[in-house]
Amino acid sequence: MSILQPLEDLSANIVTLVFNIYNFEHLDGSYTSDLKEHNGIYWCVRIQSNKAAKSQKRRVSIYLVCNPNNSSPDWSVTTSFGFRIINSWGKSRNKISTLFNHTFTSNETSKGTSGYCTWDELTAANSGFLVEGRFQIEFDLNVNSSTGIRKEKISKEKYEKYIADGELITDGKTVKVCLALLADNSPILYNLFYVEKPGQTTFHIFDFTYEAILGMVSILQLDSFEVSVYNYRDLLELGQRYQIPSVTDKCEEFLLKTRYVSIETKLKLSEIFELHYLQFRTLERVTCIHHIDNILDDHMDIGEKTYDALLEKMKHLKTQEDGQLCSCKRNHVR
């Protein structure tokens, strides 16, 4: 449930933005996440913590940052928002902020909490917040109003004439691209463009369809693009191959919302492509021990980490009071 949900007049306009924070245990200073677009405005999260502080006093500060595009000098964005730091051990372990009501301007582009929590709370081995060096922050955001922001979309013709400086060829078709944009988002493509083949502007891409390549480029350019049941798998594989988090995140957002992909498939995908937030949210939907038994019995190819997570979920369900019926109307207490 949204942390803004009590404000019923706002609930219809709330969007949830999920940010991945990588290599958190090495943080010394400030970390700024990838951008997320909402209402024609780009948002990111900034995390601050310094190693110079004594370990027992080291704290973590968290801020939401507003980055409007095509804005006038006197722009403003009035918002209500709050955030959660997601715990891999269950919803009850999440850390939840207070509700913020804030107007972002050119003079105040960020808002959050200084010294929100201690460093040890997030990094301790038994905390449940860090998963392979990464943790996730989920913002519930409502944009009440904005001024001085123009929503402009560059035409395909202008993009190809003034911005595109390279070509990707696949399936005999050509996609015109900005090589620097792709390289900034993918260390693999950076190495290909500027280390292995410097000066080259045309590259053949194998193993991926034209539609997948076009989807990747559209996501990176923040163009309108819909992930669907027909393309999410190709995009996940492409995002993993070229190490492009924004493509993987876009697919994860789709999988979190869709009902046309089964719980079992989502759990498998969450391990294959390291979609920890998807695994967390999908496990929340498993509320019956009988369902877990069926998953474990019918899907022998399920990954080790998912298997362990399901066993933990089963243990949690079995700790219910003796004699209590679970959601399938059965008494599983042994």
From Swiss-Prot:
Q: Which CDD domains match?
A: MATH
Q: Tell me which InterPro entries the record gives.
A: BTB/POZ_dom (IPR000210), MATH/TRAF_dom (IPR002083), SKP1/BTB/POZ_sf (IPR011333), TRAF-like (IPR008974)
Q: Indicate the segments annotated as coiled coil, or none if absent.
A: none
Disulfide pattern: none
**PROSITE patterns, from UniProt?**
MATH (PS50144)
SUPFAM superfamilies from the entry? POZ domain, TRAF domain-like
Protein name per the record: BTB and MATH domain-containing protein 39
